[in-house]
A protein has these predicted regions:
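Extended alpha-helical targeting/anchoring segments
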Residues: 1-230
């Protein structure tokens, strides 16, 4: 359990993590929202923050401040040079992290939040200000879905993975397939929809000028064995 410092505590009975995120991202700041779900209900803690500096993974490791961001699949080749990196990508940075200048931890059990980074009075002033109104939800227009690799290529990779496992070359292989679909919906609309329909225990939303990441991550599982429910 986290101990709270009374000098940095903010009452959150009228404030949600998403509302705090909308306030902190004003002014063009790079921002992030980390949430979790436990047994179908919002988890105990949520984290909201923002910053004006974006750094790579190498810089994030040495900056000495809290960071939130991502590592692309291409980073695996740095950890294991024998791993091939797909040639076709999204022309995205291999890594990108927001250095948190303001960081707030919500405790939903206590109905309170604590300022972990930034001046408490400045952060409290932002959170107590008017909430920016998100764009009204609309009937989004979507195009056709493109999947990479194709179904045939993906199924062929599954067969190859099984061969490696049977041969003892590996005990776990994670295959992925990227789905792309053009849409008129905003990144925030997509995140709010994912929060409602996707049964995942981990949620995150991050954005900066020209960049948006929204995701819910499922738990990994394995084939059921015996009579134990999975």
């Amino acid at each position: 359990m986290f101990a709270m410092n009374a000098l940095t505590v903010i009452s959150t009975d009228l404030l949600t993590p998403l509302g705090a995120y909308l306030r902190l991202r004003e002014g063009g700041r790079a921002s992030f929202l980390l949430e979790s779900v436990e047994k179908g209900r919002l988890g105990r803690h949520s984290f909201v923050g923002c910053g004006s500096r974006l750094v790579s993974f190498a810089e994030a490791e040495t900056c000495g401040q809290p960071v939130v961001g991502y590592l692309g699949y291409e980073h695996a080749a740095r950890l294991e040079p024998t791993v091939p990196v797909p040639e076709e990508g999204r022309d995205l940075p291999e890594s990108r992290f927001v250095v948190a200048e303001m960081l707030v931890r919500f405790d939903h059990a206590l109905g309170m939040a604590e300022v972990l980074c930034g001046d408490p009075d400045t952060v409290a002033g932002l959170l107590e200000g008017p909430q920016p109104s998100p764009a009204p939800a609309s009937r989004a227009r979507s195009g056709s879905t493109r999947r990479l690799p194709s179904r045939h290529e993906y199924e062929r990779a599954v067969v190859k993975a099984k061969e490696h496992i049977r041969a003892g070359d590996a005990f776990q292989i994670v295959l992925s397939q990227r789905a792309e679909r053009p849409t008129s919906a905003s990144a925030l609309e997509l995140y709010r929809s994912l929060r409602r329909v996707n049964p995942s225990p981990y949620l995150f939303r991050s954005s900066s000028t020209g960049w948006h990441w929204s995701a819910r991550r499922r738990r990994r599982s394995s084939r059921p064995r015996g009579v134990t429910p999975r």
